[in-house]
């Protein structure tokens, strides 16, 4: 067997195992109190040994656990957590998208919308520029670094934990590096930057990810005053210099405030 055929066979087996595992999760979702292994195997059209092996893998990853009845399995709260994250993202996009579309039409630039996800931001919505001037490399589902993206800086600036920044900086030393000559990589420098962001309520990526591209971001507050989402507009440095920061910031801030109001924030 040549190496190409072997690799293709391994890939096929991996896909097959993934599909079978997902099928087991789907079946278990209909049995909140648990389902016996024999019945699971029957419903999934698998032999018991294969079903048991897949369930062990799912259990190791925290998606299933033994039920009260001997030989039965049930889903864990981890599955619910994933579903809630998806639902949360879908709900916020439903709320925010009309305002983001209006901003896109007014400014003509790339509109980005992200959610805080632990030590990263994740792009959950994006609108391409209507002026055709600049298309960025960012995409929906992309994880954004906190230290060098405008929206990431927003999340760092409004982080409630006092010691979070120091912990983040220490634990991400391999990740924190110069992407361009403008990227901030010193802790003292980012502290000054974040203080300015808190005072002005907006953040900028000044060619810190990509030369020639800049970004302006504003926080979105929920009813508890937490910043779980952020909005940003990307443009060429040429257009920023031509029209000035204020020409863009006013509309971005207005949009962020509108979405914040929709989320129940009243301190505007």
Curated annotation (Swiss-Prot):
Residues 15-77 form the HTH iclR-type domain. PROSITE patterns: HTH_ICLR, ICLR_ED. Residues 37-56 bind DNA. The keyword Transcription regulation applies. It comes from the Bacteria. One of its GO terms (biological process) is negative regulation of DNA-templated transcription. Keywords: DNA-binding, Transcription, Transcription regulation. InterPro entries: GAF-like_dom_sf, HTH_MetabolicPath_Reg, Tscrpt_reg_IclR_C, Tscrpt_reg_IclR_N, WH-like_DNA-bd_sf, WH_DNA-bd_sf. It holds the Pfam family HTH_IclR. Residues 92-265 form the IclR-ED domain. One of its GO terms (molecular function) is DNA-binding transcription factor activity. PANTHER family: DNA-BINDING TRANSCRIPTIONAL REPRESSOR YIAJ, HELIX-TURN-HELIX TRANSCRIPTIONAL REGULATOR, ICLR FAMILY. This is Uncharacterized HTH-type transcriptional regulator HI_1032. It comes from Haemophilus influenzae (strain ATCC 51907 / DSM 11121 / KW20 / Rd).
